[in-house]
Amino acid sequence: MNKIGYYSVGNKNFTNKNAALYESTCSNQPVNWYFYEDVFNDFLNKNQSTLGLIKLNELYRRRAQHLRDNYDYLILNYSGGPDSHNILMTFLQNKIHLDEIYVQYSHSVDAKIYKPTNLIKGAENIHSEYDLVIKPVLDKLKISNPEIKITIHDIFDESILKIEDETFLESGHFIGAFELIRQQQYSKPIDIMSDKGKKIADIFGIDKPLIIYKDKCVFTFFSDLAINVAGTKHKNKSSACAELFYWTPEMPEIALEQAYALYMHLQQNTALVSLFDYNTIKPNDIYRTELIRKLTINLIYDTWDHTKFQVEKPVYFSEQGRSRDKYYLTHEEFKKYLEVYDYHASSWSSVIKNQPGKVFYTNWFKIGYLNV
């Protein structure tokens, strides 16, 4: 079952965003995005009055158990951030078996271009999060939970020069040279387990609730931007399924209860409403985004330590990459790769970037009334 929604162009459906955009350009028809709006609306229509009655930690436990009961093999894509860390702690604290933790860390190259430091908070220092945040967690797990397989995937230690025009279509989301690699990599045990006929859940920490305030009401909604991280990595493996832990149509109450937690906090702290006010918010306001991120983490997770090192979220930097990729873009190691990338990107950018930065959103779901 597809758990990440789909795009439609005319009478054709796509799980791949780039393929949909390409078809839209060729056929001159609009792209529509479907992400289970009927499921979330149906839940709210039947259960609006019960929001807030169940603790979020209990919902996280139920979600983890549901995944365990329905799959043979569970893989957690672990970034060390609050979303994936909360999933990890949910499995551990409730003694629900997790088969594998999958981490992307290109140590064969990264070790040459940076030294770990907690003094740089810009997204270009994303590499330090492995040394300062991820590795300590994995080292502890090796001792406390040796039954969990830990896979550290060196995503650049492969044939990264094998870029063809088709590569862009298959990537699912046009971001830049290094996302092109990241989005197509996955844990190799997926191939092994799939060939054995096993059902595999590829679990992603997607995502924190999106909130908007308008006309004295608080709404939540969904965006395809985060969902595309799950992408189309293992499209040929029918027994592998991308599972969004939080934004799941199988348990719509998780995302809606998270949104309700923010709504209740805004009721008690009305000065914060301006952060979400549709009429006053500015696009690409990084300061506002960071405030909301920290506020949300505090309200929906009790497993996160804010003293942990974290860099800023990456922003658009150039056609080749985001701010997290600054080191890669200037390093000799990738000169040849970028030449190959640019050669193929030149033909694709004119097609896909007819809709630059295009993000699709669902309709809004009303969480509650708030007279401010």
Residue ranges and their predicted role:
Residues 1-74, 90, 96-372:
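Nucleotide-activated chemistry modules centered on ATP-dependent adenylation/adenylyltransferase
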Residues 86-87:
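Hydrophobic positions on the alpha1 helix immediately C-terminal to the Walker A/P-loop
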